[in-house]
Regions:
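An N-terminal boundary/leader segment
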Residues: 1-54, 60, 290-292, 482-489
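Gly/Ser-rich, acidic/histidine-flanked active-site/gating loops
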Residues: 3, 73, 212-214, 237-319, ...
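Glycine-rich, small-residue loops and helix-cap segments
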Residues: 17, 73, 115, 169, ...
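Conserved hydrophobic/aromatic pocket- or pore-lining residues that grip, position, or stack substrates
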Residues: 28, 51, 79, 113, ...
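Enzymes and membrane/adaptor proteins characterized by extended Gly/Ser/Thr/Asp/Glu-rich
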Residues: 70-109
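Glycine/threonine-rich flexible loop motifs
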Residues: 91-100, 272-275, 371, 409-419
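Short glycine/serine-rich loop segments
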Residues: 105-107, 111-235, 433-444, 450-453
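A short helix-breaking turn/cap at a secondary-structure junction
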Residues: 194-279, 284, 339-345, 477-488
Length: 489
């Protein structure tokens, strides 16, 4: 099947005229027509005929002997919070307050995709403004998990993860503030890669928590993530947090026998993680040991303060970043007798419940009298944790563990308890807090036949070694091969 090929293989077949790019486009659009109405993946979509025309232009360049980009002809999906200049596509963050908004410019990562001849075909559903772990916070209804449509796909990049898992795109870009690429990848049985902070430009990404946000890759394998990442990474003068230089390109293999992995004792707590998740985590850690790698257990000593500090900082940054949305230029606008009332009514109608909760809590922790007690203290904790983790990753090559405490949960299961939903991030926020690269890869199935993810994290700028290790594991195992039965019979 065409969709079984890697991204590099697909491009090679297109470049050698073995595969017509229009055939790949038609295959993807056929799957969108078949599954999207049920699963609710896309927020906006480039019409099929336009994508075919763009694919034909790539085919013509190849026929004429012209060079084409590294991603030539690949249909790629984009999360709904990454700016795209296309009259057919919105950048609405799955929020009513941005309903109908069309970006006048491309995000740098989208510009890079286009320069590499990728076909950006649509924007995908998400938790509103990237705030959530289940995709239930979208103003346009949730995306459904293709492994079990009664369960969540994860969040906030749930639509992007489902697009890749179902073949409604061959790859996707999402954003990861506390696990929003890795957790949905885990829940959908694919690979999700969050690079080092600044390795991919944030210019054009609608901000949630500016010191935590990072664009990431959703693909079937680590090899595909590396291929996509290398095509779009680089220095960006439009992003003040961009790395000062491009990372070296992905190449070669890695010997697992030379590596040292740390499995935190806190990650093996049966009160936090489910039995299936612990079993898969321990099994893969044992497998690494059998391959000759060194795997040691060690206590971190700070997990209890990680989630509170993360949410104080992210809520504070969100309350500042979302102050710019007022209902004046686009989206929901409520008429009123005064400007203040217009702002209040428009924001109240335009933002969903979870977004309003985070704005209010963020405003509170930044308010006079509470700033130092909450925001100031949270940043002190962050600095402490960052130093501890960087010291740990000087001793070990990788930190390993679960991605999420459990398997995909049922819709509505955690809606009445926001704290239970926030704890979905307990294993994933560490990478964002410390600016480290991290990756989620499939690690088996639960007793209910639901995907389980395994996470690896390395020191900043060590992205390609992280990808190599994940690719090496996937080359020797088959956890990444199963596809959702709903979409692959």
């Amino acid at each position: 099947m065409i969709l079984d090929f890697s991204l590099s293989q697909l491009v090679q077949k297109i470049q050698t005229s073995e595969l017509d790019p229009t055939a790949l486009v038609n295959l993807v659009y056929d799957r969108i027509e078949k599954f999207d109405q049920e699963l609710n993946v896309y927020r906006s979509l480039v019409p099929r005929e336009i994508s075919i025309k763009r694919a034909q232009q790539i085919g013509k360049k190849i026929s004429n002997g012209e060079s084409v980009g590294q991603l030539a002809g690949l249909p790629v999906a984009i999360k709904d919070n990454i700016s795209i200049e296309d009259p057919n596509l919105t950048t609405g963050c799955s929020s009513k307050i941005l309903d109908g908004y069309h970006s006048p410019y491309d995000a740098t990562v989208v510009k890079s995709l286009k320069e590499q001849d990728a076909l950006v075909i649509g924007t995908t559903n998400m938790d509103e403004f990237a705030m959530g772990s289940s995709n239930e916070n979208s103003s346009y209804g949730p995306t459904l998990n293709p492994w079990d449509s009664s369960r969540v796909p994860g969040g906030s990049s749930g639509g992007a993860a489902v697009a890749v898992a179902t073949g409604m795109a061959v790859a996707a870009l999402g954003s990861d503030t506390g696990g929003s690429v890795r957790q949905p990848a885990s829940f959908c049985g694919i690979t999700g890669f969050k690079p080092t902070y600044g390795a991919l430009s944030r210019y054009g990404l609608v901000a949630y928590g500016s010191s935590l946000d990072q664009v990431g890759c959703l693909t079937r394998t680590a090899e595909d993530s590396a291929y996509l990442f290398d095509a779009i990474q680089g220095v960006d003068t439009k992003d003040s947090t961009s790395l000062a230089q491009r990372l070296d390109s992905y190449d070669g293999q890695i010997d697992l026998r030379s590596l040292k992995f740390c499995l935190p004792n806190e990650y093996l707590d049966s009160e936090t993680a489910s039995g299936d998740v612990l079993e898969a985590t321990i099994s893969l850690a044992d497998w690494l040991g059998k391959q000759g790698a060194t795997v040691e257990k060690k206590s971190l000593g700070f997990l209890d303060c990680l989630i509170p500090a993360y949410y104080v900082i992210s809520f504070a940054e969100a309350s500042s970043n979302l102050g710019r949305f007022d209902g004046i230029r686009y989206g929901v606008r409520r008429s009123s007798g005064s400007l203040d009332e217009l702002y209040k009514k428009s924001r109240d109608s335009g933002f969903g419940i979870e977004v309003k909760r985070r704005i209010m809590l963020g405003t509170f922790v930044l308010s006079a009298g509470y700033y130092e007690s909450y925001y100031g203290k949270a940043n002190q904790i962050r600095t402490f944790i960052e130093k501890k983790i960087h010291a740990l990753l000087a001793e070990f090559d990788f930190l390993i563990g679960p991605v999420s405490p459990g398997v995909p949960f049922e819709f509505g299961e955690k809606n009445d308890n926001p704290l239970a939903m926030y704890l979905e991030d307990i294993y994933s926020v560490l990478a964002n807090f410390t600016r480290c690269p991290a990756i989620s890869m499939p690690a088996g199935m639960s007793k209910e036949k639901l995907p389980i993810g395994f996470q690896l994290m390395s020191k900043p700028l060590d992205d390609h070694r992280l990808l190599k290790v994940c690719a090496e594991i996937q080359a020797k195992t088959d956890f990444h091969i199963p596809r959702p039965p709903l979409c692959f019979s």
